[in-house]
Amino acid sequence: MADAPGLIPIFLLGYLLSTECAVFLDRENATKILTRPKRYNSGKLEEFVQGNLERECIEERCSFEEAREVFENTEKTTEFWKQYVDGDQCESNPCLNGGICKDDINSYECWCQAGFEGRNCELDATCSIKNGRCKQFCKNSPDNKIICSCTEGYQLAEDQKSCEPAVPFPCGRVSVAYNSKKITRAETVFSNTDYGNSTELILDDITNSTILDNLTENSEPINDFTRVVGGENAKPGQIPWQVILNGEIEAFCGGAIINEKWIVTAAHCLKPGDKIEVVAGEHNIDEKEDTEQRRNVIRTIPHHQYNATINKYSHDIALLELDKPLILNSYVTPICVANKEYTNIFLKFGSGYVSGWGKVFNKGRQASILQYLRVPLVDRATCLRSTKFSIYNNMFCAGYREGGKDSCEGDSGGPHVTEVEGTSFLTGIISWGEECAMKGKYGIYTKVSRYVNWIKEKTKLT
């Protein structure tokens, strides 16, 4: 037993030698375990890593052609290259309103959701802002895309926003060229007003005005408006939709051309049994200018709610049918009539112009040359405070508080027009007022938006 301790080291050495295959690996396998793999990329580039991409482009700087050899696909190579060259431009999420960012070299592109546009999808592209950049009418499609359209006689231009003439003499356009300085009128453009929500614009149109319209005034307003006071001489062909109505004795009212066969005017201008002659293309009523066209009226249609015995100026609008169609040219051109919504929108632009051959000052002489005048829209509260007479929902006020400029006697029935992006639309009919151009008083006009459906229905050309 004394020799037993010497056997223990021998036993342990034999055990270790017998387990060598489990402890020691060959060189190749040991290298695989001991070598730390390189984490050459942990970002978006990993999705592009294939084959020898690390050797070609990570450990060394590679060219586009070398990267192309790795991917063997131009599209994938391009996507990789955009990030490889200058980093990910989309990392800061520059696209707004749900836009999708696509990286590019030193740049990026936003793919915008429907209803938005701009470099970062920051612009509302619906009709509610600047009319969707449409030059006339705008509508939002079910998928919230803008659809621009034009009034009759126009077609969409190549940009799908502008409207260009589709006929020789489209409505609302002046085609006479002037050598003198440009004539300034009340031209307006679309602003950032919320046109998409027209509730406020037409609220007074849907107010129940039946009770008001059935009230009899204690006294009539002082004047039919048959004048433009403080205006300027129009050039020949500058207001080609303007007409003058002649009775058996003298000129007495104005009107506007709707189309070749129909004129719109004020209902209070009409007297039962009167023979009316319409003169279109007129400029100077004291001279023959060879631009005039004369037509007889064969039918008068006052609005069905007009009743002069109840109120001479409520629903003050009428249509005149001509015996022969007018020949349209640069001096005889219709005024444009939009739908109800846009007629209201155009009126709310706040600046229109009126025209006629009425008196050039209160109780003064009648104008020989056609006059025109810009008149600002007056808010309803101010309008109501300015007079003791009723201002119904089918009327509006326009003019200057300081006086001196207004429509006046002889201008009744003439057009109140708003010029939009170079095309003029009918927004009112000259109706009545107290004196002419008196301080604190305004001209009162028939609100055409209330009657556009009636106008279009009655004046269809067959």
From Swiss-Prot:
Self-association or partners: how does it assemble?
Heterodimer of a light chain and a heavy chain; disulfide-linked. Interacts (inactive and activated) with F11 (activated) in calcium-dependent manner. Interacts with SERPINC1. Interacts (inactive and activated) with nitrophorin-2, an anticoagulant protein from Rhodnius prolixus.
Propeptide positions: the record gives: 22-39, 186-227
Positions binding Mg(2+) 1 in this chain are 54, 59
Q: What is its EC number?
A: 3.4.21.22
Domain comment, as recorded? Calcium binds to the gamma-carboxyglutamic acid (Gla) residues in the Gla domain. Calcium can also bind, with stronger affinity, to another site beyond the Gla domain. Under physiological ion concentrations, Ca(2+) is displaced by Mg(2+) from some of the gammaglutamate residues in the N-terminal Gla domain. This leads to a subtle conformation change that may affect the interaction with its binding protein.
Which residues are annotated as active site? 268, 316, 412
Disulfide bond sites? 57-62, 90-101, 95-110, 112-121, 127-138, 134-148, 150-163, 171-336, 253-269, 383-397, 408-436
What is the official name of this protein in its record?
Answer: Coagulation factor IX
Q: Which residues are glycosylated?
A: 78, 92, 199, 208, 214, 216, 226, 307
Q: How is it modified after translation?
A: Activated by factor XIa, which excises the activation peptide. The propeptide can also be removed by snake venom protease. Activated by coagulation factor VIIa-tissue factor (F7-F3) complex in calcium-dependent manner.
Phosphothreonine modification sites?
199
Positions bearing 4-carboxyglutamate: 46-47, 54, 56, 59-60, 65-66, 69, 72, 75, 79
Q: Give the subcellular location.
A: Secreted
Q: Summarize where Ca(2+) 6 binds, as residue positions.
A: 75, 79
Catalytic reaction(s) noted: Selective cleavage of Arg-|-Ile bond in factor X to form factor Xa
UniProt-annotated binding residues for Ca(2+) 5? 65, 69
- Signal peptide limits: 1-21
Chain positions recorded as Ca(2+) 3 binding sites? 47, 56, 66, 69
Query: Taking every annotated instance into account, which residue ranges of this chain make up the domain Peptidase S1?
Result: 228-460
Residues in domain Gla?
40-86
Give the modified residues of type Sulfotyrosine.
Answer: 195
